[in-house]
A protein has these predicted regions:
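Aliphatic-rich helix starts adjacent to a transmembrane/signal segment
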Residues: 1-43
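Flexible, low-complexity segments enriched in proline/glycine/serine and punctuated by aromatic residues
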Residues: 27-158
Length: 158
């Protein structure tokens, strides 16, 4: 009889260990998913900025996200309106895919020998400065409200 009780105790401890491993695996899987989403979102915005060099030159993408602005570009847009549309779409994606997702973008022309004039920018030259993007999110929002935010920082040239 004692052997059965000891066997049940050993078996239950083993099951608890297996359950703990499954919880850790699920948590790690969720963290990997969120980090993949951050990478995709950052690349998406960088590509939007690359497609709208005039908006980048004018500083229309600089700022903090999520952004509450709304711009409908179904009938055509100026570069500034397209940047506002991109900001709104990306803000929506940040809120949808990342818990407590926020970001900031800052593009500078520091160190450039010459910054183009407005007339030259209208000719759509590629952006010559650097942009920095920082995305923050919470990986453990449901488990621990005081968990530190994760961040992804990227220096790029659109």
């Amino acid at each position: 009889m004692i052997e059965v009780l000891v066997a049940m105790l050993v078996f239950s401890v083993g099951l608890l260990g297996a359950a703990g491993l499954m919880v850790v695996a699920a948590r790690s899987n969720q963290a990997a998913y969120l980090r993949t989403q951050v990478t995709f979102l950052a690349q998406s915005m960088a590509e939007r900025m690359q497609a709208n060099a005039i908006g980048v030159w004018n500083g229309d993408y600089n700022g903090h996200y999520p952004d509450a602005g709304v711009q409908d570009c179904s009938g055509g847009c100026t570069p500034s309106q397209l940047a506002q549309h991109d900001r709104q779409r990306w803000s929506s994606q940040l809120k949808t895919f990342l818990p407590q997702g926020e970001a900031s973008i800052a593009c500078t022309t520091d160190g450039l020998p010459q910054v183009p004039s407005r007339e030259q920018i209208a000719l759509r030259p590629p952006y010559g400065g650097n942009c920095s993007m920082v995305v923050t999110w919470s990986e453990r929002r449901l488990v621990d409200a005081d968990a530190p935010l994760q961040s992804f920082a990227w220096e790029f040239q659109p």
